Amino acid sequence: MQYDVARIREDFPILSRDVYGKPLVYLDNGATTQKPRCVVDAIVNEYYSVNANVHRGVHFLSQQATELHEAARETVRRFINARSTREIVFTRGTTESINLVASSFVAGQMKPGDEVIVSQMEHHSNIVPWQLQAERSGIVIRVIPIDDRGELMEDALEQLFTPRTKLVSVAHVSNVLGTVNPVERIVARAHAHGVPVLVDGAQAVPHQPVDVQKLDADFYVFSGHKVYGPTGIGVLYGKEEWLDRLPPYQGGGEMIHTVSFSGTTFAELPLKFEAGTPDYVGTTALARALDYVSTIGMDRIAAYEHELTQYAKFRICISSEIRRIGKVSFLSRSVIFTRWIWVLYSTG
């Protein structure tokens, strides 16, 4: 079936507007994506027709809202091929997901002097949470270097493992360089040392199929707004055995089972990590976004982006006015434009 770009553009109302007298061309999807009409409609419909708190009431609207919320969790599970909805935790986004793991993992699994490995190409949301934990808990951050092609130096990674290495946290796709990291190999290397892996999938999920069981990552995180969903909603996938072992990140609301002044018991997974009233409208809209791209086909999206990437690279390479950064022949990248004159090869 043909990839009908014109038809797909019609699904995005904002793309029908003019900017400075010309049709809008939007290239900032690495920061946030525009929203198809079906996602906006899902938000409006829930507020107009279903709005009620979830997991809290026995009345009709609450039950209906809860069903939509948990159906969204199942949609996410299916989209990334997790084993169980118990492994799908809703958060505010990739940044909060990483902070959740950093806080709970350090509290439950690390001691002063223990080490976490990150890469030199990480987004600051996968650097600063670990720096905060280093200041508070005395853990040590070790960094995987990159070479002049913008790729991880895997041999150097191997040398970073020590008996005190407790976690590797690495991007699936770099938001700056666009490098698609060999996550399966990284996970296999880490697991050979008995070390779990967190993968930042914020820039991967919108562009390629993601199968968390195939990757074998212990944690995988992404944001809804980068995959045509609403802002303020994100996902933490965690293997059930790891989520069971970690302490809660925040307290109150959804995450409690019983409360008394003598002690509190916590809800079962995944609610154990979902304190407060969840963004149940956001989860429904996220599910609609994932259904939307699934209907188009993630394989077809990836193939079309590859065609665009190859054409863009060709045009860039014959231009004498554009500075190129990155390995031109590296086919697993597309193009990032920065200030219109600097070009980085990436998957963004």
Segments (PLM) and residue ranges:
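Pyridoxal 5′-phosphate
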Residues: 1-348
